[in-house]
């Protein structure tokens, strides 16, 4: 939901997702002098409002701060023109009061007060359900709330049969994601069906929920990745959950488990639900069925209630259940989901399955980035593909904000510098520490030497083990095009934005056009993740240079305001996203005139085939 409110001096644009309410402010030039910040008050509709809190303070008012302390925004205002409330609940009506504070910090003067109401989105409106986990496992909040408690298998597996997470740490990290997946399985009744396609399939509460579904008469069939190794983790978990290879219902034997062995990365993570023998819903997204998927790295679960979409996924599942060779899998994926047009139909959902003969879909994504008129946002778990970087790096008026798993490569940093103020990257980070990955998997965490960060901030730690794995922070695969417009494009699913993902793996993506509710949820969440890591990237970089800073002290001089209204500045460009001076249209206006990105698909595939070394 979106709300705009204003007077002659102050404007606010509020965007509500499910668990985030984003607030953007704009101030008339004549009212900026002497502005000390904004106080924000919020309450459930019809109930008392309370001042929201932050961690920054005026030194004169807080001479002896503690890193764990927070402060009322009425006493220590927010000195920013973009602020988000991360403690909202889904499907709830809220009243907000925004007050601009001026004068003496010992006796603030309130001016230009604005009041408005907004409703957060329901997690599932019976068309699209969207759940993002916390995705910020190393954070100020996790330390102050749970003292950086290390996650254990006992904690993550502590789940009731009805799908409630009984451990407070895992419940906080899940943020409804694991619960939604468990509920989806648990609500399936006798005679209904579930078709599971799983890459990593080791989170026992999910497997046990599927076993209980079998026991109550649900037709459960599972395609899972089998490496054929003796210590295969999926097979071990299946054994622990006592999921049978076959079952007998009404005297008829039915296969339950189907091994996927003929591709190195069968990367899907979806579950189709059948009612009355017909596909009705599909759970998909980026979340592997693992404890790390639900409680560690950033992930999204996306539930679509649409018979046509569910049918396409069911047909895909049926093809994969036969463990096809690469050539057959490629033919099946292309047959089920032909290459999309540059402009998919209004108010539509299109699926896109892999493998494909070539990586031209990267060109399609790149064109959509270039077509963006206001804002493009991405989450990229691995390297930035050259095609994607070329699109991101083009000189454009639109802003481009990208969250990476790893520290940007030199060419990524160069693109950012060439588009300063318009293109910005953030990457997975732990405040005050360097995170060094090993190529074979795992990582080591090293404190930044000679920094004073421990005087200002609590110590953040990654609550999951670092001795194995390749993705610790960002695992979602999301592309948002003009998400603040009335015609947004949302791309989300299992597929990394890479050549291998397109040409080698089993993958699925959803392309969703024109759904502003879904766009608001995704935008507020990707913005949350982007800003969480960007602040840590910046602070760590400055600390590594040996600089010291008064990190949490508020400004009494008014200098904080200037960058928000300086032409070309990142903060000014960000503010203007919410208060545009003119209507610039949307991505679809330009996309219709773009060339066909798949025109050379066969030639590209043939060239790739020639480059392959001879076998044997």
What is each model feature region?
Residues 166-167, 191-196, 373-377:
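Glycine- and acidic
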Residues 337-412:
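Beta-propeller domains
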Residues 176-180, 205, 360-364:
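Well-ordered alpha-helical segments embedded in enzymatic catalytic cores
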Residues 172-187, 202:
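Short, compositionally biased low-complexity segments enriched in polar/charged residues
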Residues 138, 143-167, 172, 312-367:
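Aspartyl protease catalytic domain
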Residues 1-167, 178, 182, 190-192, ...:
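PLD/PLD-like phosphodiesterase catalytic module centered on the HKD motif
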């Amino acid at each position: 939901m979106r709300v705009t409110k204003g007077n002659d001096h102050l404007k606010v644009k509020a965007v509500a997702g499910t668990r985030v309410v984003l607030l953007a402010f704009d101030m008339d030039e004549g009212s900026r002098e002497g502005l000390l910040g904004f106080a924000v008050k919020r309450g459930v509709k019809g109930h008392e409002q309370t001042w929201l809190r932050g961690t920054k303070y005026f030194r004169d008012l807080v001479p002896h701060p503690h890193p764990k302390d927070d402060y009322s925004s009425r006493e220590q205002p927010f000195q920013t023109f973009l602020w988000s409330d991360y403690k909202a609940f889904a499907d709830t009506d809220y009243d907000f009061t925004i007050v601009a504070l001026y004068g003496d910090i010992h006796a603030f003067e309130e001016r230009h007060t604005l009041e408005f109401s907004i409703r957060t989105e329901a997690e599932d409106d019976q068309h699209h359900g969207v759940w993002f986990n916390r995705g910020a496992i190393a954070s100020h909040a996790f330390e102050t709330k749970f003292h950086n408690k290390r996650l254990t298998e006992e904690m993550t597996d502590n789940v009731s049969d009805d799908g409630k997470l009984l451990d407070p740490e895992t419940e906080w990290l899940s943020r409804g994601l694991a619960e939604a997946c468990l509920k989806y399985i648990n609500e399936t009744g006798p005679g209904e069906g579930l078709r599971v396609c799983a890459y990593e399939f080791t989170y026992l509460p999910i497997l046990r929920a599927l076993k209980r579904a079998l026991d109550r008469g649900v037709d459960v069939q599972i395609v899972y990745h089998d490496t054929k190794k003796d210590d295969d983790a999926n097979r071990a978990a299946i054994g622990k959950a006592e999921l049978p290879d076959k079952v007998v219902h009404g005297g008829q034997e039915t296969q339950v488990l189907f091994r996927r062995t003929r591709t190195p990365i069968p990367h899907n993570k979806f579950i189709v639900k059948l009612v009355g023998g017909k596909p009705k819903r599909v759970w998909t997204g980026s979340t592997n069925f693992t404890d790390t998927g639900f409680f560690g790295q950033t992930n999204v679960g996306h539930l679509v209630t649409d018979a046509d979409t569910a049918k396409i996924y069911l047909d895909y599942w049926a093809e994969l259940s036969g463990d096809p060779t690469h050539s057959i899998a490629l033919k099946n994926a292309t047959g089920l989901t032909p290459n999309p047009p540059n402009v998919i139909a209004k108010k539509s959902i299109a699926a896109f399955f892999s493998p494909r003969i070539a990586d031209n879909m990267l060109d399609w994504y790149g064109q959509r980035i270039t077509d963006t008129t206001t804002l493009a946002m991405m989450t990229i778990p691995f390297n930035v593909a050259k095609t994607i970087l070329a699109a991101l790096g083009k000189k454009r008026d639109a802003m481009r904000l990208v969250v990476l798993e790893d520290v940007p490569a030199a060419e990524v940093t160069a693109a950012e510098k060439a588009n300063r103020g318009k293109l910005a990257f953030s990457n997975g980070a732990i405040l005050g520490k360097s995170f060094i990955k090993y190529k074979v998997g795992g990582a080591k965490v090293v404190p930044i030497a000679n920094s004073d960060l421990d005087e200002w901030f609590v110590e953040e730690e990654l609550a999951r083990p670092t001795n194995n794995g390749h993705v610790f922070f960002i695992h979602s695969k999301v592309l948002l095009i003009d998400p603040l417009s009335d015609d947004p494009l949302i791309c989300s699913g299992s597929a990394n934005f890479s050549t291998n993902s397109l040409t080698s793996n089993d993958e699925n993506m959803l392309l969703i056009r024109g759904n502003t509710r879904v766009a608001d949820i995704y935008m507020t969440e990707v913005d949350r993740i982007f800003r969480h890591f960007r602040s840590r990237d910046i602070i760590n970089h400055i600390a590594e240079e040996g600089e010291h800073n008064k990190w949490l002290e508020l400004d009494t001089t008014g200098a904080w305001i200037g960058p928000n209204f300086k032409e070309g500045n990142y903060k000014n460009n960000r503010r203007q996203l919410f208060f545009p001076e003119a209507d610039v249209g949307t991505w679809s206006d330009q996309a219709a005139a773009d060339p066909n990105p798949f025109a050379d698909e066969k030639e590209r595939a043939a060239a790739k085939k020639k480059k392959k070394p001879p076998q044997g």
